[in-house]
Amino acid sequence: MVQRIVLLMVVGVAFTHSIADAHYLWVKIDQGNGDHGTANIYFEHSAAAGDGHYLDPFLESKTTWIRTVAEIEPKRLSLVEKRAEPDKRWVETPLPAKNPRSVDSYWLFGVYQYGKTNVLLHYYARYLDVDSHEDLHELGRADQMALDMVPHDSGRKLELRVLWNGKPVPDSVVHVRGPKGYKHNFTTDKRGIVRLTIGEDGEYSFRTSFEEQKAGKHGEEQYESIRHTATLMMTLPLSE
């Protein structure tokens, strides 16, 4: 009986961890909604509307910007919470300019307890809505994002550099997902770069994280470390 209780406790803890670990911040653009499209922002396992269970801690901290080639400086956007049946909840913002553009979002979750360890969680998400190599070069880097993934294309070849405060991050795992079930994980080299060949045309997502072994206090809560997680989405290959 004791063994069974212990096992259930372990499973319960693992399940709690899996819920927290499996949620990430995502930006997607609905091109057909509004004059210039609408950015939908989700905090879910994947880039789609879910129950929005973990949205509440973000209510005072979420910030989203748009950058265009014509206006490269980030312009802050107003966000509106949306709900749909059954039990769908997300955040959206109408976009004031057409592509080429980058929609960049940063949200601070706060302190989350993993087992006995309190971790301060930061989330970053971007959608690069570009068609050409030149536009990608202009919009690829989001300077306001502490953790960023910067793509560089050459035909069907793609390099992605992971940056922390503008500096390359070696040995960082980058999770890549794409059309027709494409799924592969890469590790950055000493220059913070991963390289891949684009197979099927379509929308790709990239995800990485960075850990700071730094203790501190957020509000009234103490934490032992800081975790930053970033996602990037874009359609590949570029047409020009």
Residue ranges and their predicted role:
Residues M1-I5:
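Positively charged n-region of N-terminal signal peptides that target proteins for export
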Residues V6-T16:
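Bacterial N-terminal signal peptides
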Residues D21-E240:
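N-terminal soluble domains immediately following signal/targeting peptides that reside
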